[in-house]
């Protein structure tokens, strides 16, 4: 990497870091860089009992697994719980409640279920694994399962998990790379999966990628296991068995699973995704990214460090001066 390129990258990282200090509601939770894959799935039912699944290849090893529950009218999460594969779930992380003017105290919660899932998958035959799931509160609107696995046969990639709640005025996520992207390279991929709760009836959110609006229809209750929709099954998750959403899909076409490749250009060093809760009546509580290469999620890419906020301005000015001297 030449010095001009490195200075530009560090300056960009500083600006991204500063921008990231602005309040956001959908924030990075975990990032995995290496030979990783990810599976996502959703489920919802007013019966409060069903099946949620994961796709894991043979020979892979479970690194982490997280179970989310989306709720309504219960910001304290009173009585929220359940089981996964017959074991009790401790939902110990409240991901926050969407403030007014959004309705209904929309709140999601997360549990680490690695210790439950790992023994059931590691050393198994590979393929689709099904897990029994239950809920304990009528305020629970469904669940999402995110499973990250390592597989030495895979190339280097980045898995980023963000969670929280959907700001009415929008959230921006940046995936930042140390080298320019080449979307035309064989095997290049960039995938995004959203988890959205309390959504139906044309309630929708919007998604932009590097300034291109790719959907105004993110939402619906695609993972409802019941014959009809009702509070208690209004959830959709971009799942491993969903087709990728087409560009600007209709409400029924949007699967909340997206390939971002067509919205990238050769030479891009970041992927910027903006989600907006336009309806003020549903909750993007989770976003999962899986992209080729090494990336930082709302932070500089691996190997690039930035100073503490108190020294950002002086450091940036020094780098600008050095760059001008090199160009003169």
Question: How would you label these PLM feature ranges?
Answer:
Residues 25-303:
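Disulfide-rich extracellular domains of secreted proteins
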């Amino acid at each position: 990497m030449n010095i001009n390129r490195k200075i530009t990258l560090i300056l960009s990282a500083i600006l991204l870091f500063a921008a990231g200090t602005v309040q956001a509601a959908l924030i990075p939770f975990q990032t995995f860089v290496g030979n990783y894959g990810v599976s996502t799935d959703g489920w919802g039912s007013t019966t409060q009992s069903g099946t949620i699944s994961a796709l894991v290849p043979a020979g892979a090893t479970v690194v982490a697994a997280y179970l989310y529950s989306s709720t309504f009218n219960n910001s304290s999460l009173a009585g929220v719980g359940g089981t996964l594969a017959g074991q009790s779930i401790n939902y110990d992380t409240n991901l926050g409640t969407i403030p007014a003017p959004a309705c209904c105290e929309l709140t999601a919660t997360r549990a680490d279920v690695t210790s439950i899932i790992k023994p059931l998958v590691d050393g198994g035959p590979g393929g689709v694994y099904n897990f029994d799931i239950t809920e304990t509160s009528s305020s629970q609107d469904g669940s999402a399962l995110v499973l990250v696995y390592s597989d030495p046969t895979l190339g280097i990639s980045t898995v980023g998990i963000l969670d929280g709640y959907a700001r009415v005025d929008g959230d921006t996520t940046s995936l930042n790379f140390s080298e320019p992207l080449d979307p035309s390279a064989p095997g290049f991929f960039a995938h995004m999966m959203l988890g959205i709760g309390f959504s139906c009836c044309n309630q929708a959110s919007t998604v932009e990628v590097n300034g291109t609006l790719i959907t105004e229809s993110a939402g619906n209750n695609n993972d409802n296991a019941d014959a009809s929709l009702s509070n208690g099954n209004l959830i959709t998750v971009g799942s491993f068995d969903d087709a990728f959403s087409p560009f600007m899909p209709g409400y029924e076409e949007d699967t909340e699973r997206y390939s971002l490749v067509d919205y990238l250009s050769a030479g891009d060093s970041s992927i910027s995704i903006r989600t907006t809760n336009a309806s003020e009546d549903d909750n993007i509580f989770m976003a999962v990214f899986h992209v080729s290469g090494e990336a930082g999620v709302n932070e500089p890419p691996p190997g690039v460090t930035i100073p503490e906020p108190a020294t950002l301005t002086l450091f940036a000015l020094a780098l600008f001066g050095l760059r001008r001297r090199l160009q003169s």
